[in-house]
């Protein structure tokens, strides 16, 4: 399936790269599935940059008191502590986009400021990254709820979940909410 857009053209597509950080790739909460999507993510970012489209990174950002937070009680694994190596977006990924690319630090699964970032235009949005079943789905649904007429897609070949089963469940949830799923079944970690 290719990402299709409503007729009438658009000014610019936006790629949102969700939480592609060391702790989620091969750090505290990393997985073999996450490591296997990195090259697809880099290729996708470079394609958007080459086409003159917009790239935005999100960065899961916690404070040193993470273990005392609600999330820390339910997921007692310190991760993405601001300034730590695990919080960083690996240079291979970060350097695929221009230096002045917007990076949104978010303290929760979903970002609540999409309305001010994406404005009211109808340009399509595509999301990729980690974890499909937590932050990718949270942000895709937040964008779809804020902009119900906007084309929103997730490229599953550039995503990995906490587990393959939870990744698939998140894709189903997003499909039910009219979010287009691209490359389903073509995730590199399925090979």
Predicted feature residues:
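Active-site acidic carboxylates
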Residues: 5-103, 153, 162, 168-176, ...
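Acidic active-site catalytic centers that drive phospho-/nucleotidyl reactions
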Residues: 19, 133, 157
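Secondary-structure boundary/capping motif
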Residues: 33, 113, 135-136, 162-163
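Histidine-anchored nucleotide/phosphate-binding helix
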Residues: 44-47, 137-147
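Active-site beta-loop-alpha junctions enriched in small/polar residues
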Residues: 60, 109, 157-159
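Internal catalytic-core helix/loop-beta-alpha segment
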Residues: 83-134
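A short glycine-rich beta-strand->turn/loop micro-motif centered on a GG-aromatic cluster
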Residues: 126-130, 149-164, 184
């Amino acid at each position: 399936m290719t990402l299709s857009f409503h007729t009438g053209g658009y000014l610019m597509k936006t790629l949102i790269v969700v939480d592609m950080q060391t702790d989620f790739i091969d750090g505290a909460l990393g997985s073999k599935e996450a490591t296997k999507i990195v090259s697809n993510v880099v290729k996708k970012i470079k394609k958007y940059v080459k086409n003159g489209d917009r790239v935005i990174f999100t960065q899961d950002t916690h404070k040193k008191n993470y273990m005392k937070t609600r999330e820390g009680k339910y997921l007692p694994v310190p991760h993405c502590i601001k300034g730590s190596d695990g919080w960083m977006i690996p240079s291979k990924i970060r350097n695929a986009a221009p230096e002045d690319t917007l990076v949104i630090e978010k303290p929760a699964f979903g970002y609540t400021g999409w309305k001010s970032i994406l404005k009211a235009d109808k340009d399509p949005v595509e999301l990729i990254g980690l974890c499909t079943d937590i932050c990718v789905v949270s942000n895709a649904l937040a964008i779809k709820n804020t902009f119900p007429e906007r084309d929103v897609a997730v490229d599953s070949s550039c995503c990995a979940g906490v587990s393959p089963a939870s990744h698939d469940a998140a894709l189903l949830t997003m499909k039910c909410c009219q979010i287009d799923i691209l490359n389903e079944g073509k995730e590199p970690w399925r090979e």
